[in-house]
Amino acid sequence: MNNNLHKFIMYRVLTNIADDYLLASTMFFKGGTCAVMLGYLDRFSVDLDFDIKKGSNKNTIDEHINKIFNKLDLKVNVKQKEKLFYTVKYKTKENLQSTLKVSVSDELCESNVYKPYKFDKIDRTLICQDLPTMFANKLVAPLDRFKKKKIVAGRDIFDIHEFFISEYPINNAVIKERTGLEFKAYIKKLIAFIEKNVTEKTIDQDLNYLLDYEKFNKIRKVLKQETLLFL
């Protein structure tokens, strides 16, 4: 993957979403790319993830999103209209990954808090999960991803580690709503999951292309243990 080109494509899509009144008012930016662009995480991120405003018309949103893809000459390879999930392909040199995933989730969490943030990279403002909400959802992500997809993602552990190092606040209500557990009970469950399922191989496979070489080699041996200590 050409990281600079991929980042440029993401910025173009985000700029057009911000300039579309309907999308900007009904799609709320979240996830790793959002955290990276706001300076909360120091890694590369490859997908665009959003929450959808309650009561929004998914068909209308789908139409507006596809207009942006057409405008930017992005070919839709995979489309799940009922889930508002898209994989689009952009032009690049041969033999390089050149796909971007855009996901708009309608699995609403009433405890999520959203606010507008200015994104200097694109000179636009987007409504996003606020920082405590983002951290809470990061903590829920490892078990939620494994439950839905049977996948263990090293980036989930890295993000939790980085958020703890920065001493970011946590919206405990999100954890309670999404897991049905109080904070301490959920953290106990998360610790057991990490101890059992996160391996050095998991970390290496997921993070080697998301971190620069120096940072990757510095963190890979200690990430699991340090994260468990934080928890």
PLM-predicted stretches and their roles:
Residues 1-27, 38-41, 53-231:
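Structured mid-to-C-terminal alpha-helical surface segments
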Residues 29-34:
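Glycine-rich beta-strand-to-loop/alpha-helix junction loops that act as flexible
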Residues 44:
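Conserved donor-binding loop and adjoining core beta-sheet/short helix segment
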Residues 50:
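Structural signature of FAD isoalloxazine-binding scaffolds in flavoprotein oxidoreductases
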